[in-house]
Amino acid sequence: MASLGILVAGVAHEINNPNGLILLNMPILREVYQDAEEVLETRYHEQGDFTLGGLPYSRMRNEVPCMLEEMQEAANRIKRIVEELKDFARQDTSTTTEPVDLNNVVKAAIRLVDSSIRSATRYFETCYSPSLPMIQGNAQRIEQVAVNLILNACQSLPDSEHRISITTLYDQEKDSVMLKVSDEGIGISPENIPHLTDPFFTTKRETGGTGLGLSVSASIVKEHGGSLEFDSEPGTGTIVALTLPCCRRT
């Protein structure tokens, strides 16, 4: 796994450099075309149709702005994929830990993805158990898991009329705290559930999923001595339960 991480880091770096140039230059190209569009339109209306890039301008005048927009979106998508690859390669096993309040971590995660939540659903509910015991861990790493689970829930919804619920609670019997992320999304096929945390396994390949988000999350949870459990029914929704042990009491 360490060798795979090194390979992935190298590939991510090689992809990131040329994509960085695309992201840098695309806004400039879009502005250039906007400035040139007035001249092109004047010629089109005064002299009739002409070719642009070997194709009729009457066609390209509508298609070029769409092409530029698609290129910008594709470059942003590559950037997101590279960031996931780098997260996978990093696999930070830092032993720097501290007492962590799960409620605060979840609230911070929700703030980070607020725009995605608002775009995905009109019905977002939270229920925080009061006075949760502290857990021992790395708050930033646990927040990364919470962000991933919430974004997955957002992406699973067929429309904004479906609900997402976030709940924290304390399991006294197991002396552990739990985060439950429930959605009314499309659900997960039973045969896919055992593979959800496998590296590079994804049911969202066509929309740019890398299959690394849950793999990285599972590694972080394992570092903290916790567990990730999935309960899903196709067409009904999914419940993901993150369980983490509480701090040892002295």
Briefly describe each language-model feature range.
Residues 91-95, 134-137, 203:
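Conserved micro-motifs of the catalytic ATP-binding
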Residues 107, 120-133, 169:
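Conserved catalytic submotifs in the C-terminal HATPase_c
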Residues 220-222:
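Detector for a conserved hydrophobic position within an alpha-helical segment of the HATPase_c
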Residues 213-217:
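Short alpha-helical Gxxx[C/S/T] motif in the catalytic ATP-binding
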